[in-house]
């Protein structure tokens, strides 16, 4: 029997009906609000699918993250290289051989992997993909404010049982591109403006968080920072230049990004893309900045998953990454969540600081078997990222103390147990808060978030050459906090110290030193008689609305400069 007939025999064995399993039985497959089907995809249309191959030594990877991130460890700051991580997690030869043979037999082509070899992306026709992934049925969909197009299957898929030890999930089937949660308020009318401000700008941020004109990058190090875009929108260099002309006059800054990873289209700029770039580069002023851009992606690809693949394929990356993406934990399969968590763990082992927005739905709300519960967000709930909540000025027109922004996401994971680094802080909150919701609404033993916060209300943004006021959301607070951490990395690098890396173990050991404690306000939740729209409330120390608080830059710099 020739090699081709052998492959066909292998493929026939793999697709035999009863010997199959579902890798993601709990994946939500409902069409998101605002999306509509345009009909079945043509059988000969090409799809790009990503196969997540089973990794090795994940427990050892977790131990190494703890060792390199804990200031009390002799390995603190001795981060792994991408090649070190690849040696650790690379799938077994049996896994690589089995999956490659299966895909080759199915007619997959133009397959490419990443340095860590734990993802394999291949092109197949719709006909081949539906045969390969039993049960899948691909349709064209359109939705979201930008009329984004996607090819997805809302049907469960199954894989040959022989692949169960080798494949975690297949990307490009169920998960739809995210949409923006940014809000824009009408501009308030204020009689007289002496001593007042009419919205958050870089100068307001620098005043509130005690930055001086000297708190900028030196331009002499290899320090860099990045933001990632997963929405179907763009930023424009001309908007960034205009933003800095209007608002960057009192500090040294860069007026263009150093590198765009991905494709920048020529369409209209998006407010969220503009916001991320403008405030990362004004908070982390004069520091080289990358933008990971998803526009131009194929309709069958998942933008967030593609970003994770990029991290697994670049040896030299920016030290700080800010990300404004999130999904409800319950909308994602447990297999997908656990695998993405491992990808975030890989980044932490390499000394990358990943900051994720906590979300803009407060504690969230959903109904389970007729009972309301809070609804945590992922990756905000991952124990391997630093999650950023949101605040408002007590007086929205003055640089005052901060209070909770009621939309600030926060709560307790239903997937991840509470990590040891936050045990003391969370236990103290749960035992001392006078305003806890009923225990049936949240998992008190889960990973609690956010970890920190910053202003998230009333920002000025320049988009499509137009200054736009009163833009709000944790998509604003996240790049601000990230930029300040980049400034601290600058000082550490100049002193010969390693970059901050995964911040949480150190952050919780310091008990909020270097941060303004936000003690007033509660965020929103379920609109029912039991909780009446109130989720968790802030209080002294850590809380699940604003974390440890907002940055006091000189004090935070001092706190984080110790080796």
Curated annotation (Swiss-Prot):
Residues 199-563 form the Peptidase S53 domain. SMART domains: Pro-kuma_activ. Activated by autocatalytic proteolytical processing upon acidification. N-glycosylation is required for processing and activity. One of its GO terms (molecular function) is sulfatide binding. It holds the Pfam family Pro-kuma_activ. Ca(2+) binds at residues 517-518, 539, 541, 543. Its cofactor is Ca(2+). It comes from the Eukaryota. It catalyses: Release of an N-terminal tripeptide from a polypeptide, but also has endopeptidase activity. Keywords: Autocatalytic cleavage, Calcium, Disulfide bond, Glycoprotein, Hydrolase, Lysosome, Metal-binding, Protease, Serine protease, Signal, Zymogen. The active site is at 272 (charge relay system), 276 (charge relay system), 475 (charge relay system). One of its GO terms (cellular component) is membrane raft. InterPro entries: Peptidase_S8/S53_dom (IPR000209), Peptidase_S8/S53_dom_sf (IPR036852), S53_propep (IPR015366), Sedolisin_dom (IPR030400), Tripeptidyl-peptidase_I (IPR050819). Residues 1-19 form the signal peptide. Glycans are attached at residues 210, 222, 286, 313, 443. Binds 1 Ca(2+) ion per subunit. Residues 20-195 form a propeptide. Lysosomal serine protease with tripeptidyl-peptidase I activity. May act as a non-specific lysosomal peptidase which generates tripeptides from the breakdown products produced by lysosomal proteinases. Requires substrates with an unsubstituted N-terminus. Monomer. Interacts with CLN5. Interacts with CLN3. This is Tripeptidyl-peptidase 1. It comes from Bos taurus (Bovine). The gene is TPP1.
């Amino acid at each position: 029997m020739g090699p081709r007939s052998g492959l066909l025999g292998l493929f026939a064995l793999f697709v035999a009906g009863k010997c199959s399993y579902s890798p993601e039985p709990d994946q939500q497959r409902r069409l998101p609000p605002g999306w509509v089907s345009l009909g079945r995809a043509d059988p000969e249309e090409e799809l790009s699918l990503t196969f997540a191959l089973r990794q090795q030594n994940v427990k050892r990877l977790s131990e190494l993250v703890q060792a390199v991130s804990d200031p009390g460890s002799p390995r603190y700051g001795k981060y792994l290289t991408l090649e070190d991580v690849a040696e650790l997690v690379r799938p077994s030869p049996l896994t690589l051989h089995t999956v490659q043979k299966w895909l080759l037999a199915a007619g997959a082509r133009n397959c490419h992997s990443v340095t860590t070899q734990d993802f394999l992306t291949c092109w197949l026709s719709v006909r081949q993909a539906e045969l390969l992934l039993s049960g899948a049925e691909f349709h064209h969909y359109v939705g979201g404010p930008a009329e984004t197009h996607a090819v997805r299957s809302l049907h469960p898929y199954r894989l040959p049982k022989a692949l169960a030890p080798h494949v975690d999930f297949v990307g490009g089937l169920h998960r739809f591109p995210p949409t923006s949660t940014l809000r824009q308020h009408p501009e308030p009318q204020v009689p007289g403006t002496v001593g007042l401000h009419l919205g958050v700008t870089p100068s307001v941020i620098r005043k509130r968080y005690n930055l001086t004109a000297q708190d900028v990058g030196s331009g002499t190090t290899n320090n860099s920072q990045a933001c990632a875009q997963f929405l179907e929108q763009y930023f424009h260099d001309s908007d960034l230049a205009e933003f800095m002309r209007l608002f960057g006059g009192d500090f040294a800054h860069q007026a263009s990004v150093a590198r765009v990873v991905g494709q920048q289209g020529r369409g209209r700029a998006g407010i969220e893309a503009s916001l991320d770039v403008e405030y990362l580069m004004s908070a982390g002023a004069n520091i080289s900045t990358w933008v990971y851009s998803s526009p131009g992606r194929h309709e069958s690809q998942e933008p967030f998953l593609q970003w994770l693949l990029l991290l697994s394929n670049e040896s030299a990356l920016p030290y700080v990454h800010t990300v404004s993406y999130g999904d409800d934990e319950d909308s994602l399969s447990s297999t997908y969540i656990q695998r993405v968590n491992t990808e975030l763990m890989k980044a932490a082992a390499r000394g990358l600081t990943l900051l994720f927005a906590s979300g803009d739905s407060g504690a969230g709300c959903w109904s389970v078997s007729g009972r309301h519960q809070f609804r945590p967000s992922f990756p905000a709930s991952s124990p391997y990222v630093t999650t950023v909540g949101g605040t408002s000025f007590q007086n929205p027109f003055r640089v005052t103390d901060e209070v909770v922004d009621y939309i600030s996401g926060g709560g307790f994971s239903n997937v991840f147990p509470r990590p040891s680094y936050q045990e003391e802080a969370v236990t103290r909150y749960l035992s001392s808060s006078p305003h806890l919701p009923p225990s049936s609404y949240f998992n008190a033993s889960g990973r609690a978030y956010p970890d920190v916060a910053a202003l998230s209300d009333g920002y000025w943004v320049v988009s499509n050459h137009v200054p736009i006021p009163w833009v709000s959301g944790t998509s604003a607070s996240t790049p601000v906090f990230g930029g300040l951490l980049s400034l601290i990395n600058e000082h550490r690098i100049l002193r010969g110290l390693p970059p901050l890396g995964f911040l949480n173990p150190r952050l919780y050991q310091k008990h909020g030193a270097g941060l303004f404690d936000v003690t007033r306000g509660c965020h929103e939740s379920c609109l029912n008689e039991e909780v009446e729209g109130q989720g968790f409330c802030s209080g002294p120390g850590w809380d699940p609305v604003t974390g440890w608080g907002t940055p006091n830059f000189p004090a935070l710099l001092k706190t984080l400069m110790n080796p």
